[in-house]
Amino acid sequence: MATIGRETTISWLGHGTFHILTPGGKKVLIDAWVDGNPSCPDEWKQRVRSEGLDVIFLTHGHFDHIADILALANETSATIVGQFDITSWIASKGVSQDRLVGFNKGGTVEVAGIRATMTHATHSSTFTDNGVIVPMGTEAGYVLRMENGFTIYHTGDTAVTMDMQIIGDLYHPELVILPIGDHFTMDPMQAAYALKLIRPTFAIPEHYGTFPILRGTPDQLREQCNAFGVNVTVIDLKPGESVS
């Protein structure tokens, strides 16, 4: 497996959930679906609690990205970051406002030494709360700059958009995390074109294989990258695996 070499460890917990150990020792979760996530190893369901979390970034409000946010809010001391609509809903459930950072696309915040810029995505964002479908703002991604300047772009659930070229031009992310599963997000061909626009060194595919309908594969992503002439190292993690 390739190595990143940027004092950062990225672990895939399955589906769209990632754990990042930053150069400064901060523990970061991107999206909060662990307990009901069929791809998440039992070890990680315990580790996110026993080791604690400093920050949780939420990309949007679908159950497979926020189902465990209230439990993790109660069981860790993490600061929770997301679009204002999502953090307002979390506050309505009793989570203290001083643990919530709500902002919006184009905005940048600094949390636990990490500079986070919220980016555009194109998807949808609702949550079923006690049988009622609740709007959760709009879908988003994040450009995350670690304490040492290492820059990660998590696209969130999305199709390919030309905004990705702007993100590449402005922020020059070295590593991109992006979905390849098809049906609910872009497929491997669109993901390869997204990487052509962004021009990172590394890519980690996600949001595939959890359910049969999410049929894109890392090998298909590599094939499409070759077809588009994209020079990128695709890091094919299995759920529970890490890369540093």
Curated annotation (Swiss-Prot):
InterPro entries assigned to the protein according to its UniProt record, in alphabetical order: Metallo-B-lactamas, RibonucZ/Hydroxyglut_hydro, UPF0173, UPF0173_UPF0282_UlaG_hydrolase
GO MF entries: hydrolase activity
Superkingdom per UniProt: Bacteria
Pfam families assigned: Lactamase_B_2 (PF12706)
Hydrolase among keywords: yes
Keyword terms: Hydrolase
Family membership noted in the UniProt record: Belongs to the UPF0173 family.
Official protein name in the record: UPF0173 metal-dependent hydrolase RoseRS_3945
